[in-house]
Amino acid sequence: MADYALFVGWNRSVAGREQQAIDLFARVMEYYGQLQNDGKIESFEPVVLSNHGGDLNGFVLLRGDAAKLDEVRREEAFTNFSIEANFCLENFGVIDGYIGDGITRVFSQWSIHFS
């Protein structure tokens, strides 16, 4: 069961780079599918948010083992996709996250500081 996640989020495409952003999304979805088939990630879920006036309009949550996701984050393909995303998407970012049993571990660590 996955205990770790990568949150890959963005706002909207840069004006004039909409087609590049659409093409990038398709290639990245294919790449994430290959990562899942290769056992490097447990799963991934793309999410597009409804209009809300904020600066987050979509994200993909990659789920898996912390060590494997750390390796994925350092792969050349992941790095290249992230660089391209920074040129065609506003507010693009990748953030580490905890899910499943990972949440319990993090809260246990935090609770030490509140005792």
Feature names for model-found ranges:
Residues M1-L56, G64-R74, V94-S115:
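Short S/T/G/P-rich N-terminal loop/turn motif that feeds into the first structured element of a domain
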